[in-house]
Amino acid sequence: MCGIVGYVGRDLALPIVLGALERLEYRGYDSAGVALIEDGKLIVEKKKGKIRELVKALWGKDYKAKTGIGHTRWATHGKPTDENAHPHTDEKGEFAVVHNGIIENYLELKEELKKEGVKFRSETDTEVIAHLIAKNYRGDLLEAVLKTVKKLKGAFAFAVITVHEPNRLIGVKQGSPLIVGLGEGENFLASDIPAILPYTKKIIVLDDGEIADLTPDTVNIYNFEGEPVSKEVMITPWDLVSAEKGGFKHFMLKEIYEQPKAINDTLKGFLSTEDAIPFKLKDFRRVLIIACGTSYHAGFVGKYWIERFAGVPTEVIYASEFRYADVPVSDKDIVIGISQSGETADTKFALQSAKEKGAFTVGLVNVVGSAIDRESDFSLHTHAGPEIGVAATKTFTAQLTALYALSVRESEERENLIRLLEKVPSLVEQTLNTAEEVEKVAEKYMKKKNMLYLGRYLNYPIALEGALKLKEISYIHAEGYPAGEMKHGPIALIDENMPVVVIAPKDRVYEKILSNVEEVLARKGRVISVGFKGDETLKSKSESVMEIPKAEEPITPFLTVIPLQLFAYFIASKLGLDVDQPRNLAKTVTVE
């Protein structure tokens, strides 16, 4: 199992190729690589391991290439090593090939080439293809490919690019899947449709014995004799949601249930690359966190962790406000921009502004190769996988994971604090097991028009996030507020028609928030509480309870947010709304 992708067009090839490779991860792989044509030269980067290893190798390299190929490899010929990973090139580095399948006569071909003086660098059958194409090239890549395929035996598919024709991409199919994606001023090759779904639904499925010759503006199909072939363009009925929903009714629900894995993968990713982090928070006078929406709420929780564990003053600012406010920033500050997509316009421009003022900038993104990923001085990655639902769920807890791990990195208690974080996936699993009870609570309040969410300290941002989730997908007005500020305004709204969601794990502010609950009850408010399982005191003061397992204070935000996500989901679903694509919202906001 492995994947081929190729791009030729008007946009930057690297992020497109990397993104397409991520969408082929499900096919299984042990290494990954890309090849780009940059200023007349072939740039090849390939790494054993996950795509994140490839991204690390590409870090800080701002390539402008508009043509590229990529590959995820599952070893067949040769062990999983950097050298055996694709793409493979000829001796001069002028042709690059990515290949799936098996060349059955590669040993015979390899010996012939060796006798002609060709030197091989890998143990793979794929390298034979690159050397043969280079040998057969006489100024026309298609002619060289036609000569080459006549010598190959086996089941295979491959894609090739050359520095001699930088705006050309050729793909060959013989027994291994390969499709062409048709765009406007750009065209694609891929092993499977999901890889290119974000860019086009127009597909040509190649048959065995066919060659696709692509430029940004043309697509021509030939047989192995070089004769033109007429092909039908298919409009795929798939979209990214239906292709990857995995049996769940909605993508959002699937992603809620993927959170234990997203948290675990993000923690593993952080720990495996921690030594490469080139800064210490304590070396700066201040941390500024800039973000929008759900990412802002993650940053807000991160503020509390950073101040508590790293001891560095931290501010959280909406990216849209930061850009136009007179925030003093200097080289004594570190600015962390959080964006799931890595393309959020306000966050991207705010980071650029901070960088211009001398700050050290860090991107926290879920999409490798995105603008924020490329443009920041350093990037941290969440490993949540593609998130299709517009309302962020698993990327939120993945962001929390990265922020927690970063904040405790310099703490004397680091080992104990990391052990706490390692417990979180299991605790989230336990919380997800309460979904049926949460659904019953949701059914009880689904017809309400307004709700108030209250929290304190670490769980005040969770109140904000819970309210945002409800309004995003159910269109019910909801407001998150610090519980201690209730008496300074929101208390005027509380009556028997106002459900009040109170987040109350047993932490340092537990007694205080119980007092807030009493204030709500005194005004006939209807209390929906989120608290520890077995908390009879809280239960006695609540009309409804959504329980979480007992946990240490620092990690409670990971747990308290889960029932709030489910609560919002069940209400929206029962109201018959489009949970995954709520009105007026976009997954990636690339405008101001």
UniProtKB/Swiss-Prot annotation:
Its main location: cytoplasm. Keywords: Aminotransferase, Cytoplasm, Glutamine amidotransferase, Repeat, Transferase. It is found in: Cytoplasm. Residues 277-416, 441-582 form the SIS domain. GO terms for molecular function: carbohydrate derivative binding; glutamine-fructose-6-phosphate transaminase (isomerizing) activity. It holds the Pfam family SIS. The keyword Repeat applies. One of its GO terms (cellular component) is cytosol. The keyword Transferase applies. It is an enzyme of class 2 (transferase). The active site is at residues 2, 587. One of its GO terms (biological process) is carbohydrate metabolic process. It catalyses: D-fructose 6-phosphate + L-glutamine = D-glucosamine 6-phosphate + L-glutamate. InterPro entries: GATase_2_dom (IPR017932), GFAT (IPR005855), GFAT_N (IPR047084), GlmS/AgaS_SIS (IPR035466), GlmS/FrlB_SIS (IPR035490), Ntn_hydrolases_N (IPR029055), SIS_dom (IPR001347), SIS_dom_sf (IPR046348). Residues 2-217 form the Glutamine amidotransferase type-2 domain. Its EC number is 2.6.1.16. NCBIfam families: glmS, PRK00331.1. Catalyzes the first step in hexosamine metabolism, converting fructose-6P into glucosamine-6P using glutamine as a nitrogen source. Homodimer. This is Glutamine--fructose-6-phosphate aminotransferase [isomerizing]. It comes from Aquifex aeolicus (strain VF5). The lineage of its organism: Bacteria, Pseudomonadati, Aquificota, Aquificia, Aquificales.
